[in-house]
């Protein structure tokens, strides 16, 4: 996975990616068998961890990181 700013994404992809304010955020989620390992690796790479892994009442482990533009990214275990 790569986390890029809008500027670097423009440079890498040559797409017309508009400037927006930090208030225009969204959440995207990625499912993994080992949330803790993903969060450990993200932390080692300097990624902002905004929610440590927690087991939710329904049994799913969920954590949150933020990309350089402040978008929330959910890292979660599969729903059983």
From Swiss-Prot:
Gene3D superfamilies: 2,3-Dihydroxybiphenyl 1,2-Dioxygenase, domain 1 (3.10.180.10)
InterPro entries with a match to the protein in the record: Glyas_Bleomycin-R_OHBP_Dase, Glyoxalase-like_dom, VOC
Pfam families the UniProt entry points to: Glyoxalase_2 (PF12681)
Protein name: Uncharacterized protein YsfE
Residues of the VOC domain: 1-78
The organism's place on the tree of life at top rank: Bacteria
Gene expressing this chain: ysfE
Segment forming the signal sequence: none
